[in-house]
């Protein structure tokens, strides 16, 4: 059953039983396709919407005729990253200004700002940082019906009309059968008022329009208005309470609210949803007709009275222009009114309109008008093109309003259905292109205001397009979107998989979406319509669960923004599965019966079983083969890329699979990547689509290979050069390094992998290491998921990773003169300067530790007023060395490493720098981090733990042939967690290693227990996969046999080096004078309320006293205590803590006179700590490592720099809760989306 498959240059033995009928699509197509649409269509739409901009008088008009994007960005992607600039290209727009009085036309090209470009990896470079725009899942515009029950159990129907932008219409019923409407969330009016306002004046007209409905009659009784004018005034009063209503102003307001495309927009998708829901065909199908229905054009009888209307007939009835049909429901006649739309390609017309390629339904009134007025084909086709906006209106129409009300009345009789808002047919994806288009539209709307104002101010004859247009609002809108939108995120670049899944992420949060607090359980839950569209597994744990999800492997987004998934069509007549692939959205899929991908087929693709297990909406049903409509394409179609990389996913509990797919994104790239022995076959596709590897652009022969360049000579003699990235820093500080995997003289094909990137091995994703594990406890070192590892993994650098930190030093202009980058630093010995060059910048290759100088820099100090004598001496003996202080860039606490790169930017060399900065130096320091105690490791099945001990190789348990284990895991971690996949992986890994195989075991279609048992027996292992182990310390055999094998283990980004932290003295908070908290602020460990109780319980009075005074906020006491420790004296009595003084001040602010009195009645003066307190010993003790302990950051900043700081460091005052490092930190899979 096992067969070899090729993945890149490696052959894997695949256990898959199902043939792949469809290639997995390009995984970052979502991003690329959407941005491409924005450049080609999106921009055009926005410019067309806003053109022409007319002056208030109407004699000037400004039109945006055309636009182009120059295809030469100023810097390449790599240069932009180095220079902290944005990768963008100038947008040029052709503008036409028409003077309608004189007929004069001025045309010119206007620069409209730089538009950020998408890199070929689907990301943007904004200010040097790589960012991703996450797609957003929002409610689709359209009309939604909902039912609720009042306290008497009576069914009430509610409807909401949601446009893309514009006023909402909400229809509601009360218990007395009166239907009301709310316009734009204002007070409600009876529905008949709205009907009168759109032209149905009298009660008879209304009843005639919608049928003699009880609810309509009850509503008419409630309605006080009697004509269109009264109705308009009634609506005006609701919308503009307090303003005097006139019929004219009421009519113009009402029309502007709903029928002005600038104010009201359904968007393409809204129109599509409206027509789908309200058109006749879906509503009358499968009901009996109450009357004979005749085609008004041909006179043909379509349906006889009492005959059941089939789907095909219903479509025919609608497409011949019939808009009202009466049907029989339980013996009652119910009138169904559509929204007057037809499919133009099926409407009986004398001309062929297929060349126009109109997919949407069109308004039949406008169509008839065109056909009546024009007689020859060319004129009709032209008129149809010109009147597209009327045929397919973007705003709501009167027909739509009538159809909405008709649908609501029909629902009372059980005709139609209510909507489920969590169904993916009612939620759509807004990708980059659309989000960007909306931002651009906002910018242009602001620009329009400016242009109109300028048109009135400037002289009509002198005016030019350039001086009318101010591009500032457009540029600002785009900058704001990329810089600070919730959906523009700093790319997760830990490894190639995290990049890939970040680009495929779908978020329900963000502007126009949900908020974490408001989102209930239903929105977050897995829905049956997610099948094949949104992964049920990959979502963060914590407050964002279910709100942030991932697209599945085969999913794609259609033009309306709905997620589609592919199916194979089944020929119902013969029960044969064809190779025809159909992509379907969630609401289309609801109509069909769909078989699973693993349903057995014979060699002719016929179903083998008599009954086929299928899905129909949320039901699982069993049907004969002739009733099946479609079949899944692949078993992995229901999961995302991350989840499809977990072998034996089907044997893991869903909660653990979730952790497994999230933790793969946190694996750090290792020094020696190694592809998994037991994979799923998805590793190659994931690595290639992530953009981490380099692919050959053409066929050819490798001419030259060096560490950072590959040259390939193509068939036609051209040379392709490929430049590799060497030891670059990723967004997360991991190392990006590419290595060639071809040799000189090799023949390569187009699309072949020629260079590996981080975490890839021969073109396959390689996030971890294959290690020999045994499931056995060892001396309690596996307690609570802890992991015992062998020293071998440390010595061989098996789990070693490289991390690169970036440090910046800027030389600015200050009030007292410019800062200077120099080697001449006051009070620093030559020893500290040994690695600096003559400019004062560290040399590449230097090894640095915490506190070492990276860039020498001095800042001028304020000079005191000189006396006359000093000035005289100064004049005679020349300038004394100017007073400067040392502000060098030093390696922060706890950091060390080797300098791998230094970049210097300065004004003189013409580099762009922020205002006030003359020179900038950027130093990159790399660290090699071996695996160490406290690091977090995990498998792919959610089995995570922290390393508790590193044991010498000779002490590890060993196999009968003397091979020592590399890792011991706790067997108790398996049963309760129900992730049995790890055990199967271990067994299969053992066999594969013995046979020298690499294995592909795809999800839901991989190796079975039987397959593994057979292989174990064949390879000479015990069929239960257990081995006798011996104690490495004594050589004695253990009592029981142990499960041993190869498992793929990942080293995660939660490294102990980043979490370790210690402090003796450091910065203090401003108000409370207590130490700050957290590693980033170099803070202390919080000794909280509960810890105080513990010391109180033990009666440890002295410890408790110093905890609360000299170790915290007794300002004088801590200085004296430090001095005493340095001098070796006894520590003096503590004073009054600052927090007590703060408390006293707060009480005094409540007008309570608080005094502190000693036992013998002496009053103690309470004075808040100030800089110039006399009783503070000399500050030369250099207690505060971080500079002046009491100065607010603003002051320090202003002394050094001329301008005000833009943002203050946030360590001025901290909430007391974030002081202690939470032990949970190690186990929280922190998802950056949170």
Curated annotation (Swiss-Prot):
A single GO molecular function term of this UniProt record: DNA binding
One GO term describing the cellular component: DNA-directed RNA polymerase complex
Keyword Cell inner membrane (UniProt): no
Listed EC numbers: 2.7.7.6
Keyword Transcription part of the UniProt annotation: yes
Biased composition (Acidic residues): 1192-1234
The protein's assembly and partners: The RNAP catalytic core consists of 2 alpha, 1 beta, 1 beta' and 1 omega subunit. When a sigma factor is associated with the core the holoenzyme is formed, which can initiate transcription.
Protein's recorded name: DNA-directed RNA polymerase subunit beta
Organism name: Caldanaerobacter subterraneus subsp. tengcongensis (strain DSM 15242 / JCM 11007 / NBRC 100824 / MB4) (Thermoanaerobacter tengcongensis)
């Amino acid at each position: 059953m096992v067969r070899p498959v090729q993945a890149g240059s490696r052959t894997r033995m695949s256990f898959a039983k199902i043939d792949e009928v469809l290639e997995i699509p390009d995984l970052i197509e979502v991003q690329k396709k959407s941005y491409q649409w924005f450049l080609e269509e999106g921009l055009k739409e926005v410019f067309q919407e806003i053109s022409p901009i007319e002056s208030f008088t109407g004699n000037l008009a400004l039109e945006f005729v055309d636009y182009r994007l120059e295809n030469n960005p100023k810097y390449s992607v790599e240069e932009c990253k180095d220079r902290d600039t944005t990768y963008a290209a100038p947008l040029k727009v052709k503008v036409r200004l028409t003077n309608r009085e004189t007929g004069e036309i001025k045309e010119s090209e206007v620069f409209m700002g730089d538009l950020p470009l998408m890199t070929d990896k689907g990301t943007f470079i904004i200010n040097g940082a790589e960012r991703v725009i996450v797609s957003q899942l929002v409610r689709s515009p359209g009309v939604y019906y909902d039912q609720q029950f009042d306290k008497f159990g009576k069914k009430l129907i509610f409807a909401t009309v949601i446009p893309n932008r514009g006023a909402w219409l909400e229809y509601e019923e009360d218990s007395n059968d009166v239907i009301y409407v709310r316009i734009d969330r204002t007070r409600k009016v009876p529905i008949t008022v709205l009907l009168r306002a759109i032209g149905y004046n009298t009660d008879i007209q209304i009843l005639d329009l919608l049928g003699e409905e009880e609810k309509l009659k009850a509503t008419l009784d409630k309605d006080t208005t009697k004509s269109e004018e009264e109705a308009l005034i009634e609506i005006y009063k609701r919308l503009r309470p307090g303003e005097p209503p006139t019929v004219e102003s009421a009519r113009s307001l009402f029309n502007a609210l709903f029928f002005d495309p600038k104010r009201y927009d359904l968007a393409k998708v809204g129109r599509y949803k409206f027509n789908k829901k309200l058109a006749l065909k879906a509503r009358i199908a499968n009901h009996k007709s109450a009357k004979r229905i005749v085609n008004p054009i041909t006179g043909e009888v379509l349906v006889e009275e009492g005959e059941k209307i089939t789907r095909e007939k219903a479509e025919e009835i609608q497409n011949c222009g019939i808009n009202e049909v009466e049907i029989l429901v339980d013996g009652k006649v119910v009138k169904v009114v559509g929204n007057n739309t037809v499919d133009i390609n099926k409407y009986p017309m004398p001309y062929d309109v297929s060349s126009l390629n109109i997919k949407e339904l069109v308004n039949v009134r406008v169509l008839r008008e065109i056909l009546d007025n024009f007689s020859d084909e060319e004129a009709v086709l032209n008129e149809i093109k010109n009147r597209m906006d009327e045929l397919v209106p973007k705003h709501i129409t009167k027909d739509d309003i009538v159809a909405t009300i008709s649908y609501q009345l029909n629902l009372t009789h059980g005709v139609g259905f209510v909507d489920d808002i969590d169904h993916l047919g009612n939620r759509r994806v807004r990708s980059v292109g659309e989000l960007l288009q909306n931002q651009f539209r906002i910018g242009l709307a602001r620009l329009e205001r400016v242009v109109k104002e300028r048109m009135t101010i400037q002289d009509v004859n002198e005016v030019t397009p350039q001086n009318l247009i101010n591009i500032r609002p457009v540029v600002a809108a785009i900058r704001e979107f990329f810089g600070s939108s919730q959906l523009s995120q700093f790319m997760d670049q830990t490894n190639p998989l995290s990049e890939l899944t970040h680009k495929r992420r779908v978020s329900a949060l963000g502007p126009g979406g949900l908020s974490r607090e408001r989102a209930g359980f239903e929105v977050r839950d897995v829905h049956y319509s997610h099948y094949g569209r949104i992964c049920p597994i990959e979502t963060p744990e914590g407050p964002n669960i279910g709100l942030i999800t991932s697209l599945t492997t085969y999913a794609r987004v259609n033009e309306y923004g709905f997620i589609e998934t592919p199916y194979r069509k089944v020929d119902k007549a013969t029960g044969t599965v064809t190779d025809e692939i159909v992509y379907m959205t969630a609401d289309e899929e609801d109509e069909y019966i769909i078989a699973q991908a693993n349903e057995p087929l014979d060699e002719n693709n016929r179903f083998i079983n008599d009954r086929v297990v299928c899905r129909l909406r949320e039901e699982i049903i069993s049907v004969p083969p002739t009733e099946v409509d479609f079949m899944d394409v692949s078993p992995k179609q229901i999961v995302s890329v991350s989840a499809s990389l977990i072998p034996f996913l089907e044997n893991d509990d869903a909660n653990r699979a979730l952790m497994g797919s999230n933790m793969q994104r946190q694996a750090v790239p290792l020094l020696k990547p190694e592809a998994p022995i037991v994979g799923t076959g998805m590793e190659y596709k994931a690595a290639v689509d992530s953009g981490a590897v380099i692919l050959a652009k053409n066929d050819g022969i490798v001419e030259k290979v060096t560490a950072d360049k590959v040259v390939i000579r193509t068939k036609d003699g051209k040379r392709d050069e490929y430049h590799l990235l060497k030891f670059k820093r990723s967004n997360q500080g991991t190392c990006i390094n590419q290595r060639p995997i071809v040799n000189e003289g090799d023949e390569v094909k187009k699309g072949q992998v020629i260079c590996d990137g981080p975490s890839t091995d021969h073109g396959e994703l390689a996030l971890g290491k294959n290690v020999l594990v045994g499931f056995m406890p060892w001396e309690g070192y596996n307690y609570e998921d802890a992991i015992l590892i062998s020293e071998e993994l440390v010595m061989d650098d098996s789990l070693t990773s490289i991390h690169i930190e970036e440090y910046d030093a800027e030389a600015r202009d200050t009030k007292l003169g410019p800062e200077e980058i120099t080697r001449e630093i006051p009070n620093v010995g030559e020893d500290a300067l040994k690695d600096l060059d003559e400019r004062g910048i560290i040399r590449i290759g230097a090894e640095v530790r915490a506190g070492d100088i990276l860039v020498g820099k001095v800042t001028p100090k304020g000079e005191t007023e000189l006396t006359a004598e000093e000035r005289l001496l100064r004049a005679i003996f020349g300038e004394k060395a100017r007073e400067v202080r040392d502000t060098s860039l030093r390696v922060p606490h706890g950091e060390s490493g080797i300098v791998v790169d230094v970049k210097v930017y300065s004004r003189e060399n013409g580099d762009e720098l922020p205002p006030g900065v003359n020179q900038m130096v950027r130093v990159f320091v790399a660290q090699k981090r071996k695996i160490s105690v406290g690091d977090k490791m995990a498998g792919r099945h959610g089995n995570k733990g922290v390393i508790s001990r590193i044991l010498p190789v000779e002490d590890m348990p060993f196999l009968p042939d003397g091979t020592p284990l590399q890792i011991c895991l706790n067997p108790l971690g398996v049963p309760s967690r129900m992730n049995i996949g790890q055990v199967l992986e271990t067994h299969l890994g053992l066999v594969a290693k013995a046979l020298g195989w690499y294995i592909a075991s795809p999800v839901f279609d991989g190796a079975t227990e039987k397959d593994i048992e057979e292989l174990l027996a064949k390879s000479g292992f015990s069929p239960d996969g257990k081995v006798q182990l011996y104690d490495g310390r004594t050589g004695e055999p253990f009592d029981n046999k142990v499960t041993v094998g190869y498992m793929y283990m990942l080293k995660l980004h939660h490294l102990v080096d980043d979490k370790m932290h210690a402090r003796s003295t450091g910065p203090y908070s401003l108000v409370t004078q207590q130490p700050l908290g957290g590693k980033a602020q170099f803070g202390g460990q919080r000794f909280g309320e509960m810890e105080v109780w513990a010391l109180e319980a033990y009666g440890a009075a002295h410890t408790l006293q110093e905890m609360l005074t000299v170790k915290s906020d007794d300002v004088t006491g801590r200085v004296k205590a430090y001095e005493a420790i340095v001098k070796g004296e006894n520590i003096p009595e503590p004073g009054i803590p600052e927090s007590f003084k703060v408390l006293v001040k707060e009480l005094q602010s409540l007008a309570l006179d608080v005094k502190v009195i000693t036992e013998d009645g002496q009053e103690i003066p309470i004075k808040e700590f100030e800089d110039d307190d006399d009783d503070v010993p000399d500050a030369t003790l250099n207690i505060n490592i971080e500079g002046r302990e009491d100065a607010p950051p603003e002051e320090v900043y202003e002394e050094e720099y001329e301008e005000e700081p833009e943002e203050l460091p946030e360590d001025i005052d901290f909430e007391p809760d974030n002081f202690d490092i939470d032990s949970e930190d190690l186990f929280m899979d922190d998802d950056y989306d949170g």
